[in-house]
Amino acid sequence: MINKRLNNHIRGHRIISVMVLCLFGFCLMQAMQAPKKHARKRPHGDRVYLLHADELYYDMFGNNPDAQILKGKVSFLHQGSHLTCDSAYFYQASNSVKAFGHVHYRQGDTLSLTCDRAEYDGQMQMMRARKNVVLHHRRQTLRTDSLDFDRLYNMANFFDGGTLIDGKDKLVADWGEYHTETREAKFVYNVKLRSGKDVVTTDTLYYDVRKSKAHMVGPSKIVSGASVVKTEDGYYDTKTDRAQLYGRSTVIDKDKTLTGDTLYYVKDGESTGYGNVVYVDKKSKNSLTCNYLRYNEKTGNGFATRNPVAIDYSQKDTLWVHSDTMRINTFHINTDSVYRKVHAYPKVRAYRLDMQAICDSLVFNSQDSCMTMYKDPIVWNGNRQLLGEKILVFMNDSTIRFAHVIGQALSVEQMPDSVHFNQISSSEMKSYFEKGEIKQGESIGNVQTIY
């Protein structure tokens, strides 16, 4: 009885031990078989099948004793893709092919590749094409002398110079890659994109074939007629001629320059600038700084806000105008001559060497160098102060020429003792200046004086 119980006890322990060992072995096998998340293994491809060859033989004593030597209308099939050539070495053991002469590779209805010679690895699903390589994918054509096509990742790489043609867009680079599934390309070193008459040069460019949109990285330039765009981080849409520029970019159009932290540039249309925007017109000799600007290159009209400052240096003395908002309108007198009107509002501040002014709103006309101020304007000239409902100031090359005060005009002149003031008030007042000083004054309507 005791022996029987002892045997049952031992047998129970054996069963438990076997179960533990089985469970441990199962866990160990699972751990060994668990795939690595960071590595994507290439599957073993199906066999490469020889469909046809006019001649087939072996050369056991030659350079390729393991190869079937094929000649004449050679044709292979591998996982739905076809490879044809004039002659080939077929390595059946390694599932690979070396093809020569009029090599033509076809994959489905959208991709074909031609070259002078190629190596195809069925295990790695890799095609290495050399000499006069032409890859056609949908409406795109890639030309190069050295190209590797990875079927598993749908990636074509060239590394000895290549050209991608996409409709009117033509991209040239020393090195590049093209993804046939996403239809995105990357080009590096001496990159040049031609789109119609526009030319983009850069060292690194990402190109989205579906959107015809290029992303330039590093020092880049877009030349479009007389316009030149410089950027180090920009997106360019070849269909719409629109560019999004970041990282302190510049647009140059003949004598005009637009610079900003962020620019949205539209060829022959309205462009927008954000952050430290600087606009310079060298021909008209004026400039504008602000933190937000809309400017139409075709019409010459613009809108500026966020601390705008307009600077006119067309005369010997420079005029500075500051306000919350500014509007710029350009007018063409004839083909070669233009003038501008600057509307500034509110909280206007203006400064020249011989004149300072404040008002609620101001209009400056570059044609007659007239500055018209509205709503509580005040003008200072030396020791004289002019006030009124509206003030017009006309300027010469370097000084004030004429001032016209309309409505509740008041002139205050500080005397040499800095204590007393001469004052004249009237409905209208005209002041004529010479060398920055009042030479003659006229007060019209309800004149009152205090001396």
Where in this protein do the model-derived segments appear?
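Bacterial Sec-dependent N-terminal signal peptides
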Residues: 1-39
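N-terminal amphipathic/hydrophobic interface segments
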Residues: 31-451
